[in-house]
Design a protein with these regions (language model features):
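Phosphate- and other anionic-substrate recognition elements at nucleic-acid/protein interfaces
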Residues: 122
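Intrinsically disordered, low-complexity regions enriched in acidic/Ser/Thr/Pro/Gln residues
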Residues: 165-168
């Protein structure tokens, strides 16, 4: 009983932020790896380096602000197997899923549009689909960042979608996303049990065009 209490106390003032994507240098700037770019931005801002943690199947970094610890994870698994890493992280830290934030790309949202959901289906996203399967629940926070739709190609929609998500973020898109990352980081740091509804509402109504 004491051990359980200690674990709950230890991690109540922490946030676990996991980005989904594909490992390997050739994928780093892909639209599918938009969460990777966010965590890179996060770690550079707070001067925290990533190291590989094999038991967690992830690259890991952490930093503290006002006695609050932020644990950042970049799974070393491919997108379709994201659940293996997320399950390993959840089991190792024995965390409450309220403290878990999954960052993913969303092809159905305009570039830079944010959608924060506390639960829900995968929406056709293979990474989320695998996490739901491995955790056996849809009740976890996910923050979707829009990457925009691919140009219309009626002859081969599937191939068109794949080439879009695996295509690199352009320099123009990066300017928009930098502002989105800044807003997201500020919001994740401010987020607490008392202001949660307000922060989520603010993120979901954030207009990236107005901040260009």
């Amino acid at each position: 009983y004491m051990f359980t209490y200690k674990v709950e106390f230890m991690y109540s003032n922490e946030k676990f932020i996991i980005r989904l994507g594909n490992p390997g240098k050739e994928y780093i700037k892909n639209r599918h790896n938009i969460g990777f770019l966010l965590l890179e931005y996060f770690s550079e801002k707070y001067d925290s380096k990533f190291t590989l943690k094999n038991k967690l199947k992830s690259w890991y970094s952490e930093f503290k602000i006002n006695n609050f610890t932020y644990r950042l994870f970049m799974p070393n698994t491919f997108m379709n197997n994201s659940g293996n890493a997320v399950r390993a992280i959840v089991d190792w830290y024995k965390i409450d899923l309220d403290r878990l934030f999954i960052i993913v790309d969303d092809i159905d949202l305009p570039l830079g549009k944010i959608r924060f959901r506390k639960k829900g289906s995968s929406g056709g996203h293979n990474g989320l689909k695998d996490i739901i399967k491995k955790l056996q629940t849809e009740n976890f926070n996910r923050i979707k960042i829009g990457i925009g739709s691919p140009p219309v190609n009626e002859r081969n929609k599937t191939l068109n979608t794949i080439s879009h998500v695996l295509g690199n973020v352009s320099s123009k898109e990066s300017l928009t996303l930098d502002r989105v990352y800044k807003k997201l980081i500020e919001s994740l740091i401010e987020l607490n049990d008392k202001n949660e509804d307000y922060i989520i509402s603010e993120l979901n109504s954030f207009h990236r065009e107005e901040n260009l």
